[in-house]
Amino acid sequence: MKKNKNNNQKAKIFIDKNSSLISFNKRILERLDKSDFPIFEKLRFCSIIDNNINELASIRLKEDKNLIKSLVSLKNEVDNKFLMYLFNIMKSNNLKLSKTFDKNELKELKSIFENKIKPNFQTIDNTKGINLRAISSGDTFFVARLENKEYIKNVSLEGYDLEDLYFMMENNEDIKPKKSVPEFILNFSRIDNIPRFYTLTTGKIVTLEMIINVLNNHIYKDNKFIDGGICRVIRYDNIEELQLDPELSTKKNLKKVHKRNNRSYPSLIEIDTDIDDKTIKLLAKSFNVKTNVINRFKLVGCSTAFNIDFNNIVNIEDKYFDNQKPFNNYDKDKLLETIKNQDVLLSHPYESYDTVIDFLKEGVNNPNVKSIYQTIYRVSSIDSEIIKLLCEGAKNGKDVNVLVEIKARGNEGMNLHIIDKLTESGVNIIKTYKNIKVHSKALVLKEIKENKINYYTHLGTGNYNEKTSKIYVDYSYFTYNKKLGEEVIQMFNTLDNKKDSKVSKGELFNYSVGSVREIICKELDKLDKALEENKACKCTIKVNGINDFDIVNRIYESARKGVVFDIVVRGECIICPIDNIKIKSIVGRYLEHSRIYRFEIEGEYDKLYLSTADLMTRNLSRRIESIIEIQDKKIKDEIINDLASYNYDNRNGFYQMKPGKWKYIDSVYPIDVQKYMYCKNNNKDTH
């Protein structure tokens, strides 16, 4: 916990950022223990935490060396949970993990290796030593310590004359080779895309590492196998060194990405518990790190271990979350007509993301739609429906303009390739700023009909990603509002012309760097002023994370004056529950991702905003985010009702009772907000 003294004001209390993130992941683990999620989904959640640990290790360890103990402890908890769930699956299906095999089973193991493992068993060429540049952060390998066949003790006499040899023999001195040859070498084989568990016809379960160890003589024919196991390397993410330049070619930017991914030093190396100390020392020497960077775990790469070949023996159907039903008040071929008559709000994943695809598809096929504008941050793949439709639109002769953010962490390489694909199809690529990320999510169809210009606009709180839309809770807002459409188009024009992003604002749509912070502070100023007239004031916030000290100080200031804050935050949270501040975290089956801000003055004022920005410094100070006031009464009421429903959840919720201390909310009469939202959006009875 940190205190920040500011003149005569009371000391401001903040939760440590890293402790907050560790706490969030522990909330997920606690929620899994109390949940009725299908067991395979519990495995998926464990893999999500594993990825979160990787991110912490790559980003935060450099500034906080003491964090390693907490990460290792959390990683061990996750491994234990994952293995417990995995063994429960095996037990319920009469399967057993085995280390002994008869002759027929050994033949089957060899067949599994040849057909399922070997095709993707990519061995790094280390004839001249380990090629560290070929090992990217997060890659999972089977590392084998092999006896070097070139090492022949006391035989390599090159460099000695006969007189020297005679003298050394007379004095019983060891004759060592003049040319240094290592006794052992390390062999790395990438296994990221290979299942970690397999089912034999006899019902036995065998691990990938067990197969390799049993068949080591068959696999490593040139050098004798001594020791081996699973290994994963997490490197420091030197994000400040990754200066991608939109003006450079894709090839040159990709070189920068690969350099960042492959040349930074390891912050954490995970290895199997069975790997011996000699192999650890050789790993440390090879990677030029201390042995304390290398840690043993029961399950290395939990997120990659989720790739399981169980021959579809497990039924993971669930009655509450079956096939999603799309918004059904329109003909999908006449979606634009529906939006022309009324604003539309979709709540994902409870309502299908296909509607967003259909919206773009109709724009591509509608002859009256002359131009398409879209932002791209994280899509599902280079071959996603979104990318295909944008290419199709350009090939059909439409004016397609796409802003692809090449600095999206982890997606830099794919986004650079997407730019090439779109460019080849004739899409106009709007280049982003070198030092500012564009995180806004917008899609506009410009229609020219009967000599009139119309705009159909989609704004979302989440990415244009068909895969994550199935598990992320987000809003899609569609409108025919001409003024709003013009202001969103202005954002694209401003970015395309590289005008000053700090002065780009509209009446309905704001997108400049710092605009979200400015709007929040102005709204809080109004609430503070209303308090002076003894009017009840309330601010409701729903975000993914809160870590900006200035905005937290501003919230503390209003809370001490009497503004009531109702905050729902999923992950990182440095704010404390002082008087007038209630903080709740929702950890459900779906990942809460929407950002909502509401400001109320009792009886006379009620402003509601949707945004792409969390209360994180990166969102508030270093990104172009979008924020829009919802004015349509029907949609506004729907979002307000959704916000209120989070207060009643006693199934997924944790309250922060004291600074950094969270308590799970339980009840004999469980209310699950996500099940309620699913039923509400699909016209199902909640009982």
Language-model regions: role of each:
Residues M1-C539, E557, K561, G571-H687:
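N-terminal localization/anchoring segments of enzymes in phospholipid and broader phosphate metabolism
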Residues F549-V552:
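Glycine/threonine-rich ATP-lid/beta-loop region of ATP-binding domains
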Residues V568:
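The conserved SAM/SAH-binding core of class I Rossmann-like methyltransferase domains
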